């Protein structure tokens, strides 16, 4: 009996009415090239319609557990951030519930982990992330960067997938530097202060912003990418130096928690919106970041832990680099404490650790490969004389 000519099992057509047939492992089941192409288009449409936020929303405990792997200390801040981020994305998963957006304000000295917290959150949730410096922004019409360029960075990090960018996180640092010069509205234009707050206010509270795809200043003949910011989580950070005096005047205390002594660590400073308004933030701007999270100054012990404990700790990174050369690198506690002490003296917190350690390690990393040593012990004197660590390693190995 003659077998019928093969046809596409989806559209029923046979060549040459349709393209080539692809045979299935199942008997007499085929699909034509045209149907394959249509199926790909349908899948692409479904992909575009799918939610662009986190693929799975972790619980607050899971979020904090992940932060613990990268950020030392700051327990209260990590708990507050975990809950805030969880609620933000839960709100997006349930759009029928009328829950307002709650942006976050991080207050803490330089180098306490504000940027790291925001970055780690975005990476864990697998959402686009962008960092901006508030001091580079100006209101329209002045020399500087338009606030829409903040969203351009987010778009770039989302590979210009607008829907995905609209579920992202933006961290704006140095937000305290755009405070107006006094609590009363200025009679003159304040290019770096109130005007920038007003410009940022629009995108933070939720609007459709026109983003220039090439960056730079907007001009009339340029094409724009519309980005809806209502679901973008904005995390604002700043040191707010001098805010302690405003709080002190309000609560009538002599010490209140910005300077890092033992008592201050036990009694965290509580900043209220009125304090921020007195500092120079406009009321509308403060109202758009209702969650105020405070970070403690870091102690010497905190900095030693930062060097060794996080998943990507500096010490672990250097040890791995030396291990690739067949060398075991060990740091003494005295050396680590001295690195922490020097960073503390610089007043740059955790940011100073890498600069101090890198300066000491660069000569060692230059000379150690091919030296034949199997173990290097890096002690306190080696911070200023790093090659002595290599000499001592050779002597130990020879004896």
Curated annotation (Swiss-Prot):
Family matches, as InterPro entries = AAA+_ATPase, ATP-dep_Clp_protease_ClpX, ATPase_AAA_core, Clp_ATPase_C, Clp_protease_ATP-bd_su_ClpX, ClpX_bact, P-loop_NTPase, Znf_CppX_C4
Judging by the UniProt lineage, the source's domain of life is Bacteria
Cite the entry's keywords alphabetically: ATP-binding, Chaperone, Metal-binding, Nucleotide-binding, Zinc
For the ligand (Zn(2+)), the binding residues are 8, 11, 32, 35
Q: Which GO terms describe its molecular function?
A: ATP binding; ATP hydrolysis activity; ATP-dependent protein folding chaperone; protein dimerization activity; unfolded protein binding; zinc ion binding
Q: Which PROSITE patterns match?
A: CLPX_ZB
Q: Which CDD domains match?
A: RecA-like_ClpX
Cysteines paired by S-S bonds? none
Q: Which Gene3D superfamilies has this protein been placed in?
A: 1.10.8.60, ClpX chaperone, C4-type zinc finger domain, P-loop containing nucleotide triphosphate hydrolases
Q: Which GO terms describe its biological process?
A: cell division; proteolysis involved in protein catabolic process
Q: What Pfam families does UniProt report for this protein, alphabetically?
A: AAA_2, ClpB_D2-small, zf-C4_ClpX
**Where ATP is bound, by residue?**
109-116
Q: Does the keyword Transferase apply?
A: no
**In what residue span(s) does the ClpX-type ZB domain sit?**
1-51
GO CC field: HslUV protease complex
Q: Which purpose does this protein serve, as stated in its record?
A: ATP-dependent specificity component of the Clp protease. It directs the protease to specific substrates. Can perform chaperone functions in the absence of ClpP.
Q: Which HAMAP family does UniProt cross-reference here?
A: ClpX
Q: What does the subunit section of this Swiss-Prot or TrEMBL entry state?
A: Component of the ClpX-ClpP complex. Forms a hexameric ring that, in the presence of ATP, binds to fourteen ClpP subunits assembled into a disk-like structure with a central cavity, resembling the structure of eukaryotic proteasomes.
Q: Which family does it belong to?
A: Belongs to the ClpX chaperone family.
By what name is this protein known?
Answer: ATP-dependent Clp protease ATP-binding subunit ClpX
State the species of origin: Thermus thermophilus (strain ATCC 27634 / DSM 579 / HB8)
């Amino acid at each position: 009996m003659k077998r019928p000519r093969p046809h596409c099992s989806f559209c029923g057509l046979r060549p040459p009415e349709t393209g080539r047939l692809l045979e299935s492992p199942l008997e007499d089941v085929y699909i034509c090239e045209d149907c394959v192409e249509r199926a790909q288009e349908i899948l692409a449409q479904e992909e575009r319609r799918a939610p662009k936020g986190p693929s799975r929303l972790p619980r607050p405990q899971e979020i904090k557990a992940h932060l613990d792997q990268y950020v030392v200390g700051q327990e209260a801040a990590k708990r507050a951030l975990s809950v805030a981020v969880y609620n933000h994305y839960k709100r997006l998963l349930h759009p029928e519930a009328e829950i307002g957006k709650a942006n976050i304000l991080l207050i803490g000295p330089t180098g306490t982990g504000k940027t790291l917290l925001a970055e780690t959150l975005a990476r864990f949730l697998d959402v686009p992330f962008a960092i901006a410096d508030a001091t580079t922004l100006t209101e329209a019409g002045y020399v500087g960067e338009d606030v829409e360029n903040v969203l351009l960075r987010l778009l770039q990090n989302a590979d210009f997938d607008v829907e995905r960018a609209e579920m992202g996180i933006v961290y704006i640092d140095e937000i305290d530097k755009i405070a107006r010069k006094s609590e009363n509205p200025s009679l003159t234009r304040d290019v770096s202060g109130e005007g920038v707050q007003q410009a940022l206010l629009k995108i933070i509270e939720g609007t459709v912003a026109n983003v220039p795809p090439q960056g730079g200043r907007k001009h009339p003949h340029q094409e724009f990418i519309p980005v809806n910011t209502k679901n973008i989580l904005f995390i604002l950070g700043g040191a707010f130096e001098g805010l302690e005096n405003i709080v002190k005047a309000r609560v009538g205390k002599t010490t209140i928690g910005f300077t890092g002594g033992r008592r201050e660590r036990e009694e965290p400073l509580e900043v209220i919106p009125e304090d921020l308004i007195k500092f120079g933030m406009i009321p509308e701007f403060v109202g758009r970041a209702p969650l105020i999270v405070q970070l403690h100054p870091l102690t010497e012990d905190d900095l030693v832990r930062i060097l060794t404990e996080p998943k990507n700790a500096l010490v672990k990174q250097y040890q791995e680099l030396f291990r690739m050369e067949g060398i075991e690198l060990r740091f003494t506690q005295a050396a680590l404490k001295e690195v922490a002490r020097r960073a503390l003296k610089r007043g740059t917190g955790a940011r100073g650790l890498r600069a101090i350690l890198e300066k000491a390690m660069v000569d060692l990393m230059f000379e150690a490969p091919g030296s034949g040593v199997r173990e290097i012990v890096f002690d306190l004197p080696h911070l200023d004389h790093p090659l002595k660590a290599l000499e001592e390693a050779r002597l130990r190995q020879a004896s």
